Amino acid sequence: MKQYIKLIKKIIRVGNQKKDRTGTGTLSIFGYNMKFDLKKGFPLLTTKKCHIASIIYELLWFLKGDTNISYLNENKISIWNNWANESGDVGPIYGKQWRNWSTPEGHEIDQIKNVLIQLKKNPDSRRMLVSSWNVGDIDKMRLPPCHVLFQFYVFNNTLSCQLYQRSCDVFLGLPFNIASYSILIHMIAQQCDLKVGDFLWTGGDVHLYNNHIELAKKQILRIPRTLPKLTILKKPQSLFQYCFEDFKIIGYHPYPAIKGEISI
């Protein structure tokens, strides 16, 4: 993924040194775009090994509408443990907003299901968006959403998606985000009998934490390898019935992992 390496190099070259909520400090740029053609391979980072199980289980967790980490922990995924309360809840984050957005009238809106309906009945719609940024719920969230809004687009029976990410931890978070939304595009395309197109990513505050800069410099010395391919082994009756075993990553040959500390 040469685009990812190019982004790291730009942050190191022209980034602004900023303070942040965690106290770690960041090297930051504002506004950045990348585009991945999913027909040319699955954009899973090869310059360091990514934990595929965490990416897939987290996405399935979001799609369940779940906001308790028990499902993740049962599957040996700990990426949300630092933000959960004593009962394992992380507040009304992604899953809640995607599947059960609360209205002032007391109703709940399933944004994902609504998008699926539009994709099948009116694929030219410009209203196929999902938002995680529910202003009325922000103070109840243990960690407000970083990837906040995504929109689908269909042309020539091909599905594309654009994501806006307000805050992006480039070293630890971004590789997960790119892979996760690319998997989601594959899943929805399969459910709607569409081909996969492009994943477009837009970042707002795009940053390297100060304690990741030297790790990132090590990573950019590695030459990106051929992207793997994602295969979905079966087609469930519903988007919400996929399980971890349905996904197979073929030809993933990354460099060794580079571990970095997470800023909380």
Curated annotation (Swiss-Prot):
Active-site annotation: 146
A GO biological process held by the record: dTTP biosynthetic process
Signal peptide: none
Key words of the record: Cytoplasm, Methyltransferase, Nucleotide biosynthesis, Transferase
Source species, domain of life: Bacteria
Pathways involved: Pyrimidine metabolism; dTTP biosynthesis
Main location (coarse class): cytoplasm
A Pfam family that the UniProt record links to this protein: Thymidylat_synt
List of residues binding (6R)-5,10-methylene-5,6,7,8-tetrahydrofolate: 51, 169, 263
GO MF: thymidylate synthase activity
Enzyme's top EC category: transferase
Binding site for dUMP: 21, 126-127, 166-169, 177, 207-209
PROSITE patterns: THYMIDYLATE_SYNTHASE (PS00091)
Family to which this protein belongs: Belongs to the thymidylate synthase family. Bacterial-type ThyA subfamily.
Protein name: Thymidylate synthase
Gene: thyA
